[in-house]
Amino acid sequence: MHRLILALVLLLFASPALAAEPLTLSSPEHVLSVQVSTDGDGRASYSVNRFGRPVILPSKLGFLLTDAPKFDRNLQTADAGRRSADDTWEQPWGERRFIRNRFNELRVALTETGGLKRRIDVVFRLYDDGVGFRYEVPEQPNLKSMRIAEELTEFVLAERGEAWWNTAFEWDREEYLYNRTPITEVGQAQTPMTVRYASGLHLSIHEAALVDYAAMNLTRVEGNRFKAALTPGITEAKVVRNTPFTTPWRTIEIADRAGGLYESNLILNLNEPNRLGDVSWVHPGKFVGVWWDMHLDNKTWGSGQRHGATTAEAMRYIDFAATHHIQGVLVEGWNKGWDGEWFGNGADFSFTEPYPDFDLEKVAAYAKSKGVRLVGHHETGANAAHYESQMEAGFALYHRLGVETVKTGYVSDALGARVNGDDGKVHYAWHESQSMAEHHLKVVETAARYHIAIDTHEPIKDTGLRRTYPNWVSREGSRGQEYNAWGQPGNPPEHEATLVFTRMLEGPMDFTPGIFRMKTRSPDGVPTTLAKQLALYVVLYSPVQMAADRIENYLANPKPFKFIEDVPVDWAESHVLNGEVGDFVTMVRKDRHSADWYLGAISDGHGRVLQASLGFLEPGRKYRAEIYRDGDSADWKINPYDIVIESREVTSSDVLQLRLAAGGGQAIRFVAEGGKGRR
């Protein structure tokens, strides 16, 4: 008996974590709560409840290191501080002008009880619609640096359900169709991953403020248990950092409905405020460009008889833009380096030397004389090392010519991107590696010095850094419209309704809508109706929005093109009236510079009728609804061009019945009576 008592006493003293009380935190309105605890081995975990119901079951925390013992056991927890905040900040541009930042925060110190006695803090920030947490590593004698092989962060989902996810660790970046599977059939997923529980609750797991760190993916380990899977680096360590440092925030948005995920400001709020100061030089706007013709194989990026980027062609597009109140013109293929194997190479690109048949100085001057902004283009072939050697000169040239926005590209082959290593050599790297995270931020910071905004294609994923760097205006990061030009297959009709609740939870998306001629090189062409192409300007958000078709197709259809002329790209408010992931969505947005509202509704491959209550309009005010809807015989397969354009008077008390064809949509401009309107 004495031996048993002695053994129990020794066990209690050897396991101090057993006596630790869980630490808890609630959101401002007590919607969400988080609990942090340790088990008998001193392993720390967190869990999340919503109105007392489990959302995330106990999920482990910690790190696996390449040059030191892993940090995951013999830990004790301590409350290292709490704080709350409730403030409102203004976006210089965006899908909504004012954003409330209201949260409660808990800092948990995780300290080893023996051995190296290292300490890593985990900071939990709890909003009513989501939770963010990150590791903060202080400088300490036994932890001067960290070589991270993997995070041991887990997300154990509390219910069965289904998930929408993009496969991780594929060579073609994010340009894949989303999988829709039961949670238990997810493999390796990129984030954001969207989940709908059987109870109807919606979740999105992602990250915020990805700076000098590898992007996080998710690996399903078993059942509903997921663990973080960092993107590999150019050495055995996926992340190398000196202390002190912080990781990106790990985020979980939580909402009753799919639309609540899109309406959440969690990702933006977790990023640092604007570091650039006055950014009045960042100008949202629409643009046309020498682009779609190349995807249709009518013209080429490289030199020759079919070269698209000629002086004459650029000036023709500038004339069109000036006549139709389009702010910018993009010209791709203007610079030397497109001939030969540029795909995944990029070493031959010059960012200052135009082809002989493109007079850059003349085109820029002509655009300025017409009140049109030239949109620059830097395709890198994912050769980040080569681009960094020239980008300063490239931005300086563009700045001198009055270019305010540059579209960058990182098209690569299966070998990935090329980056400079600390050893002075060029290495291949994943697009979302720590090296590429550093590269993209270097591009954005360099561009800012020249008052240039960046629209990144084939990008690293968006994690809300546009708040900190407002010149990072948009990214592609999805299977965009070009796949409808040549894809085998193209994008299916449900694609855009999926993107709203998956990719668009990251931030602005340059999808390039506005195709008016649906026949392409792809077997199904563009699988939408004409009305849906118009609706995409409201449904899909980007502050730099392209009217992507050939201008001949716009000249042949002036009445529907008027909606593209009228629709703004900078908003005061944005709301999802209804929607289900991959099925349909109705979005309304208020123009930042007038009293007008805009509505966009889209459907998948099924026709449907949606109700749209106009309660978002100002009470007591009349509006003229300019409606662009599918005709009675519209169908994306057999009659995509059947469109009806009509108008009626409405008020906030009205409810509209929106009839959407298969693959269809509806776009509406609500012009306020007595408002100043727009041009």
Region spans (language model):
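Aromatic- and carboxylate-enriched substrate-binding clefts and catalytic-loop regions
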Residues: 333-518, 529
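An acidic-aromatic substrate-binding cleft motif
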Residues: 242-324, 328
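Carbohydrate-binding surface patches
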Residues: 581-623, 666-667
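N-terminal accessory beta-strand-rich subdomains and adjacent acidic, glycine-rich linkers
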Residues: 21-277
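N-terminal signal peptide c-region/cleavage motif recognized by signal peptidases
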Residues: 14-15
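C-terminal beta-strand-rich structural cap/linker in extracellular carbohydrate-active enzymes
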Residues: 647-679
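Edge strands and adjacent loops of beta-rich recognition modules
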Residues: 89-102, 561-587
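Catalytic cores of secreted or luminal carbohydrate-active enzymes
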Residues: 531-577
